[in-house]
Amino acid sequence: MRSKFKDEHPFEKRKAEAERIRQKYADRIPVICEKVEKSDIATIDKKKYLVPADLTVGQFVYVIRKRIKLSPEKAIFIFVDEVLPPTAALMSSIYEEHKDEDGFLYITYSGENTFGDC
């Protein structure tokens, strides 16, 4: 999936920003979170997050749910490289496995399970 953030910001600028963030906040992970294009779920008010390394994927999903004011009965799925990450996984391990060459971790979210097959 194409990232709007990548389209709007040149690679060198993104890389420099991620490096600056990692130097200043070594215990935090720079995350870009965007809605899957054709999803009917609410659009998030901000794309850029500085996430504690020890946060779990489930805790991050909770943050996203709050930001888009999603009611408890509605489903939300987050994807990293078009795969559903394990809820108990630490954001630091997801970052190490899936960070982009620019230094950001790109996460997409949707109201439906568009990529996974579970």
UniProtKB/Swiss-Prot annotation:
Keywords: Autophagy, Cytoplasmic vesicle, Lipoprotein, Membrane, Protein transport, Transport, Ubl conjugation pathway, Vacuole. A lipid is attached at G116 (Phosphatidylethanolamine amidated glycine). Residues 117-118 form a propeptide. The keyword Lyase does not apply. The C-terminal 2 residues are removed by ATG4 to expose Gly-116 at the C-terminus. The C-terminal Gly is then amidated with phosphatidylethanolamine by an activating system similar to that for ubiquitin. It is a lipid-anchor. Gene3D superfamilies: Phosphatidylinositol 3-kinase Catalytic Subunit, Chain A, domain 1 (3.10.20.90). The record marks G116, D117 as: Cleavage. GO terms for molecular function: phosphatidylethanolamine binding. One of its GO terms (biological process) is cellular response to nitrogen starvation. It comes from the Eukaryota. CDD domains: Ubl_ATG8 (cd16128). It holds the Pfam family ATG8. Ubiquitin-like modifier involved in autophagosome formation. With atg4, mediates the delivery of the autophagosomes to the vacuole via the microtubule cytoskeleton. Required for selective autophagic degradation of the nucleus (nucleophagy) as well as for mitophagy which contributes to regulate mitochondrial quantity and quality by eliminating the mitochondria to a basal level to fulfill cellular energy requirements and preventing excess ROS production. Participates also in membrane fusion events that take place in the early secretory pathway. Belongs to the ATG8 family. This is Autophagy-related protein 8.
